[in-house]
């Protein structure tokens, strides 16, 4: 694996094996990233199987073209550089109207976190950016410097679940009135200064939740995941499966809600029987989320918050 795009794949075998791979199936890796899941999935496919890989980061696709070359040479891989919110439309362009399985590994990939200039990390000094797609218009700089007080409070509380959202938004408002806030370390210092001393003694970086909130806003992560997972459920063939790995409670709650909605009969209570068209579309493969093993947690610190949910299509 190239040094500039090093990524340790989380829940590698669990997420792929739970898809119950058919050798001649059509599959989608909605979040190509470091291509670890794709490489393992492709190793389970026969010559007639095919994998469509989505990523909005050109560097991820360039890296995967090296890593997956043997499968590319056999014509088994198609790369789609786009946000996975356009899943259905982009697959349709390739003549795909039904898939046997799809995998999501939500959140920021390790290379994006580790590339200082991308501005995702509060640990390294960099311009405020946080775009997963470097061609996108909205940046963290614009969020921090142009959103009004109420909008900042809204995203900090909604996406960061930080109880000091108002105090942090006020600090930002005061600081940017003097000069724009332009770097990650400037922002991290402001966040830290807005929190009481006893809060700073707690485990974890004081800026973590606010950086998460800004990143989610910049990339509309929850909106994209919501739209894409709903499209994926529709695209699944009968007995097809969907695996979703999440890294924070907002993503997990969204996935749990979408799976519950699709796995619950849409029928009024008291009916003597449920018509086929009102029966659930999904069946949960595992009622509780699947967590990384102790061995994986020891080997990869970033796996600690990971959860995997899997469902199977039972009605078209």
UniProtKB/Swiss-Prot annotation:
EC no. given is 2.1.1.199
Entry's localization field: Cytoplasm
Which residues does UniProt call coiled coil?
A: none
Question: Which GO-annotated molecular functions does the record name?
Answer: rRNA (cytosine-N4-)-methyltransferase activity
**Which terms in the GO cellular component ontology are assigned?**
cytoplasm
Q: Where does S-adenosyl-L-methionine bind?
A: 35-37, 55, 84, 105, 112
Q: Which organism is it from?
A: Streptococcus equi subsp. zooepidemicus (strain MGCS10565)
User: Under what name is this protein listed?
Assistant: Ribosomal RNA small subunit methyltransferase H
Q: Which UniProt keywords apply?
A: Cytoplasm, Methyltransferase, rRNA processing, S-adenosyl-L-methionine, Transferase
> What Pfam families does the record tag this protein with?
Methyltransf_5 (PF01795)
Catalytically driven reaction(s): cytidine(1402) in 16S rRNA + S-adenosyl-L-methionine = N(4)-methylcytidine(1402) in 16S rRNA + S-adenosyl-L-homocysteine + H(+)
* Keyword match Methyltransferase: yes
Biological process according to GO: rRNA base methylation
Q: What class of enzyme is it?
A: transferase
InterPro entries registered for this protein in UniProt: RsmH, SAM-dep_MeTrfase_MraW_recog, SAM-dependent_MTases_sf
Q: What does this protein do?
A: Specifically methylates the N4 position of cytidine in position 1402 (C1402) of 16S rRNA.
